[in-house]
Amino acid sequence: KTYERCELARAMKRLGLDGYWGYSLGHWVCAAKYESNFNTGATNYNPGDQSTDYGILQINSRWWCNDGKTPRTKNACKIQCRELLTADITASVNCAKRVVRDPNGMGAWVAWTKNCKGRDVSPWIRDCGL
């Protein structure tokens, strides 16, 4: 499923991401835009460590989920990676909450660091009635 911007913002807010670990909702929506273009079915393979990034927030199989093919996965979110590809973003949000608690915070997302960090992210939730 490809979410509309405000539709995603509403879903993320409902699931408790607004202000989670100190990051406003705009940061999460911005990250999703640049990681997956709001597409829950997005996957990207990383040849270097043979891992794959999954879903709307491109959560990585080396550390966070199990896809049955990534060597030495840690599976810190204790989920199957395919659960991160569903139209319902609950699993992605729950795992993202685990990711962001690490010392890097949202810095775990390269696209966030490049495109959202230190920027005014309020336009990402503008006119969404939130």
From Swiss-Prot:
Domain C-type lysozyme: from-to ranges: 1-130
Organism superkingdom: Eukaryota
Gene3D superfamilies per the UniProt record, alphabetical: 1.10.530.10
Gene Ontology annotations for the cellular component aspect, listed alphabetically: extracellular region
Subcellular location: Secreted
Family: Belongs to the glycosyl hydrolase 22 family.
PANTHER family: LYSOZYME C
Protein name as annotated: Lysozyme C
